[in-house]
């Protein structure tokens, strides 16, 4: 579960390394984001010369989440870290590579570009 003020790692090569969630999309009272949900993040650490810089604000989608999520077949999926992929205004990834596995729930949410770039889909 991702909420406001949650620190996350970035799983792409956009230049950002660490981000902090500042808003969860989905209505006024929505508190938590799970796998495949969009959030707004603030860049907290970035590499020099990257696409994004520290203090930038951009959209992101959650690709890995520590809190387990139940699937329709009854199984559960969870990861060791909270990770996001940064998105541009059109909803496509800002980076050209994805690091680490991503959840299968992204395919259901129509993030096909992220799924195709990922080395492994769990």
Swiss-Prot record:
GO molecular function, one term: large ribosomal subunit rRNA binding
Keywords: Ribonucleoprotein, Ribosomal protein, RNA-binding, rRNA-binding
Superkingdom of origin: Bacteria
InterPro entries: Ribosomal_uL14, Ribosomal_uL14_bac-type, Ribosomal_uL14_CS, Ribosomal_uL14_sf
SUPFAM superfamilies: Ribosomal protein L14
GO biological process, one term: translation
Gene Ontology CC annotation, any one: cytosolic large ribosomal subunit
A Pfam family of this chain: Ribosomal_L14
Family: Belongs to the universal ribosomal protein uL14 family.
Function: Binds to 23S rRNA. Forms part of two intersubunit bridges in the 70S ribosome.
NCBIfam families attached to this UniProt entry: rplN_bact (TIGR01067)
Assembly: Part of the 50S ribosomal subunit. Forms a cluster with proteins L3 and L19. In the 70S ribosome, L14 and L19 interact and together make contacts with the 16S rRNA in bridges B5 and B8.
PANTHER family assigned: 50S/60S RIBOSOMAL PROTEIN L14/L23, LARGE RIBOSOMAL SUBUNIT PROTEIN UL14M
HAMAP family referenced in this protein's UniProt entry, alphabetically: Ribosomal_uL14
Protein name in UniProt: Large ribosomal subunit protein uL14
Organism, scientific name: Chlorobium phaeobacteroides (strain DSM 266 / SMG 266 / 2430)
